[in-house]
């Protein structure tokens, strides 16, 4: 690593970069205070920069060897948290921050006190729990979050489903001569779980795997509730026809899940009269709440549809696919898009795709780990040029790309190719 002087100098330089990022974060949070998409993106961009600089500072402070050794530390920490979650420790600690001894927690859960002490010891080094004295621990804001069912489900999904795939990634790539995975039924995930020939989605949908599907749905809920709505960048009120009648199909959300996006579009359009249609598979549609004047689904039509089949609604002004296509290999993405194209009117139909758009260089943390997850499933996060490629092959062309600096998510507007 060089001399001690060089080490200390590198720490000081990293600290300067971290301090600058912290100051920028404070400044932005002070001025960009709104809940509009531009303010939200501004705050998120500086926060991500701060986190990245903090990681860099930590790595420099550790030095090359210790930084490499943290693979033991990180996996051990994840394992301890996962075990404590399953044991029920987070539920029995008082939420007001009052400490509890290991003896009390062990008796409450009927577990080995010495085992619990070892797990808790590691889970309190830098969180999420806090050690308050010998054998005594309490909640922190970083452990209280594990009381949320969707967070617990997300952790289970990440560690039980995806971690085995990551650990076996090198093995799978060696067996496939280091070729990028491109199949939803033959990939690092199917290899790790010994289900080659079956996709993750099909496997989780089996009745015997309901608990695993529930964890997946919890993970998707976390993603949906923490994401910034990039569709807010699109001028719906200006684009959608003000002369639309009640029969005009204004927007179709394909694979729209719970319907939050199509409901948001209706609001962004100023509740223009017309049809707003939510499409998804039967099991999703059947679990939606009943529409009512007080429901967010008020004014939204629901329709069972599999996007691997031809789009049944023709001539809609807007077709939306939000955060779906990254889950599929290129061949499947093209198939999905080709099922939409014949339904689009050349004159006024637009396809909006909200997805991560991976930068050509200097990509951030989120798009990095998200792409690794997609790699495990034979899919990928795409650069703008890669998005243009799959759209072009399907008979579409990019018209406009809506993005905000520092944010990897964006909105692509496409139309049927000109003849």
UniProtKB/Swiss-Prot annotation:
| Pathway recorded for this protein | Secondary metabolite biosynthesis
Q: What is its EC number?
A: 2.1.1.-
* Keywords from the named record: Methyltransferase, S-adenosyl-L-methionine, Transferase
Entry binding sites for S-adenosyl-L-methionine: 255-256, 280, 306-307, 323
The record's section on Gene3D superfamilies has: Vaccinia Virus protein VP39, Winged helix-like DNA-binding domain superfamily/Winged helix DNA-binding domain
UniProt keyword annotation of S-adenosyl-L-methionine present: yes
Q: Name one Pfam family in it.
A: Dimerisation
Query: Which is a GO BP term held by this UniProt record?
Result: secondary metabolite biosynthetic process
Give the source's domain of life in one word: Eukaryota
Locate the active site: 326 (proton acceptor)
- Disulfide-bonded cysteine pairs: these are none
Cofactor(s) the record lists: S-adenosyl-L-methionine
The UniProt similarity line reads: Belongs to the class I-like SAM-binding methyltransferase superfamily. Cation-independent O-methyltransferase family.
Task: State what protein this is by name.
Answer: O-methyltransferase desB
Annotated source species: Aspergillus desertorum
Organism ancestry:
Eukaryota, Fungi, Dikarya, Ascomycota, Pezizomycotina
